[in-house]
């Protein structure tokens, strides 16, 4: 059986993939992606494969394309197993189940917890606890902060795959390899936080304070950046803009509704969506006119906030 993994790029996604690897001992292909690109990754899966999707929810704008590729894999003798903990519409669950997808959606834990629970992977409690600590923002296991920095230290698939294989053998110990990487990561991270605090801007929308920041592609730790900005500026919503996508964080408001209206999804307090800038905006970005791009990005969010009645001027 050709086994293919498609998972998210953060600690929870990498840990989920590590548990799949631990269960079967071998994966033929490993893909890391964001929810808005899931259909693209699925399109590259060979016919007849056993596909394992972890820590990725559905973006409604690409749902039809996702179904097309799922049908192709299943009709060619393959299988699709999907493990997630984000908020799903009942119609999505029903449609995928009817196609023949083995779907496990459980919001009571993180994605690694879902994989652990439904695949019955032995001796993996330590990794699950660490992943959930960070992903669910519980902060009840210090190792989660170490592992998230290890996973996010370098961008790109090769480092993520190295980290995934490392975590497949995680026994709860933070060894010297991980701690050395974390030490370097913290130095980089502090510079990123300092930059974000200096460059972030504020907008008001009917009493809702929105802090926004345009994040460089190499800057990871979106939730950490958002959390710092929410605290520093006493904001209701943090908008983290990137080239091609957007992340929303809040402690009090349901940002999933905003993300959903933009074709995305996620959790009530942490959500995201893809951004499709026109040629002018793309040129602004590549020419270094980042402030204009950031304004365009936050304006799209404010427009959706108004339409979902989260605020009104």
Where are the regions a protein language model picked out?
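Glycine-rich, Lys/Arg-enriched anion-binding loops that position phosphate/diphosphate groups
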Residues: 129, 136-223
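Divalent metal-coordination and catalytic microenvironments
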Residues: 10, 20, 55, 84, ...
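Anionic-ligand anchoring segments at beta-strand to alpha-helix junctions in alpha/beta enzyme folds, i.e.
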Residues: 2-46
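Short, structured active-site "lid" loops
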Residues: 45-69, 73-74
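Gly/His-enriched, cation/cofactor- and phosphate-binding structural elements
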Residues: 2, 183-313
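Short acidic, S/G/P-rich loop/turn micro-motifs used as interaction or catalytic elements
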Residues: 36, 57-61, 217-219
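Short alpha-helices
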Residues: 92-160
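A short helix->loop->beta-strand "cap" motif at the edges of active sites that frequently abuts
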Residues: 75-80
């Amino acid at each position: 059986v050709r086994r293919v993994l498609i998972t998210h790029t953060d600690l929870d996604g990498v840990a989920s993939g590590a548990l799949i690897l631990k269960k079967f001992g071998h994966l033929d292909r490993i893909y890391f992606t964001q929810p808005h690109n899931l259909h693209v990754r699925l399109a590259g899966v060979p016919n007849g494969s056993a596909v394992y999707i972890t820590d990725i929810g559905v973006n409604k704008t690409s749902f039809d394309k996702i179904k097309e590729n799922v049908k192709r894999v299943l009709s060619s003798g393959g299988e699709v197993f999907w493990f997630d903990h984000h908020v799903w519409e009942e119609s999505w669950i029903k449609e995928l189940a009817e196609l023949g997808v083995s779907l496990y959606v459980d919001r009571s834990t993180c994605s690694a917890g879902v994989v652990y629970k439904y695949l019955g992977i032995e001796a993996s409690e330590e990794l699950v606890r660490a992943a959930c600590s960070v992903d669910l923002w519980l902060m009840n296991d210090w190792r989660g902060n170490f592992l998230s920095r290890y996973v996010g230290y370098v961008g790109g698939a090769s480092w993520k795959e190295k980290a995934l294989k490392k975590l497949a053998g995680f026994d709860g110990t933070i060894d010297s390899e991980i701690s050395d990487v974390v030490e370097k990561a913290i130095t980089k991270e502090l510079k990123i936080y300092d930059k974000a605090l200096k460059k972030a801007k504020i907008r008001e929308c009917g009493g809702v304070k929105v802090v926004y920041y345009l994040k460089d592609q190499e800057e990871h730790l979106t939730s950490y950046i958002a959390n710092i900005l929410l605290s520093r500026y006493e904001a209701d919503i943090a908008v983290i803009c990137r080239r091609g996508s957007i992340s929303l964080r809040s402690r009090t408001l349901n940002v999933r509704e905003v993300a959903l209206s933009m074709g995305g999804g996620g959790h009530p307090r942490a959500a995201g969506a893809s951004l499709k800038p026109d040629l002018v905006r793309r040129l602004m970005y590549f020419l270094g006119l980042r402030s204009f791009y950031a304004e365009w990005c936050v304006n799209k969010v404010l427009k959706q906030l108004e339409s979902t009645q989260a605020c009104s001027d």
